[in-house]
């Protein structure tokens, strides 16, 4: 909720030396409270004053209440205007940094859709709303160069047949690299074109079915 996480495997000593990060904050469930609710409780008490929070997360489709799953953690962070960033590995476990989102920081289409869902569920807070960008789905427009490339590759019609959310997420993610890293942009564009040729959608674009297409 877009701010790209750093690669995993960074040496703990090197990271601490570079950014003077404190020991990761361990949030553990109490009184049989699920880890997600424990994280939300911490945010309710500390989001307005804390500068960062390090928590252990588990990637993949949430399958139990014994872990703080990445998707759940990101959703709770969005509710309070926080965002995930750096990730490190400690003893084989992924530790993720959350911190308050800066005003006017870029928003991915995926995080926007997550917020829409959280609003419908009544989970968003005023703190989370204060940092929101324009949230209308029509506020997003596919980059003209990307549209031209898809048309030249004769996959534009196929691309437009995909769910609207998938279109927005893929278009944003590819265009994100356009000025930042032209080489990565070309690789991402080629990947999108090849997948679209066979009408194949790739990546976890809807949070394992949580988000509307």
Question: Where are the predicted features?
Answer:
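Charge-dense, helix-prone N-terminal extensions
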Residues: 2-213
């Amino acid at each position: 909720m877009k701010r790209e996480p750093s690669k995993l495997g960074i040496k703990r000593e090197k990271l601490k030396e570079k950014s003077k990060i404190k020991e990761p904050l361990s949030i553990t469930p109490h009184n049989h409270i699920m880890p997600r609710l424990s994280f939300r409780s911490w945010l309710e008490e500390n989001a307005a004053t804390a500068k960062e929070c390090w928590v252990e997360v588990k990637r993949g489709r949430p399958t139990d209440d014994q872990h703080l799953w990445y998707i759940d953690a990101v959703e709770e962070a969005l509710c309070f205007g926080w965002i995930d960033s750096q990730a490190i590995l400690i003893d084989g476990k992924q530790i993720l940094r959350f911190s308050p989102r800066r005003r006017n920081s870029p928003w991915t289409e995926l995080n926007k859709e997550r917020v829409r869902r959280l609003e419908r569920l009544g989970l968003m807070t005023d703190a989370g709303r204060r940092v929101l960008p324009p949230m209308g789905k029509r506020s997003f427009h596919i980059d003209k160069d990307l549209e031209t490339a898809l048309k030249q590759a004769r996959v534009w019609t196929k691309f437009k047949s995909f769910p609207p959310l998938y279109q927005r997420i893929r278009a944003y993610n590819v265009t994100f690299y356009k000025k930042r890293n032209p080489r990565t942009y070309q690789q991402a564009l080629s990947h999108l074109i090849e997948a679209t040729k066979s009408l194949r959608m790739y990546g976890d674009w809807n949070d394992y079915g949580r988000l509307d297409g």
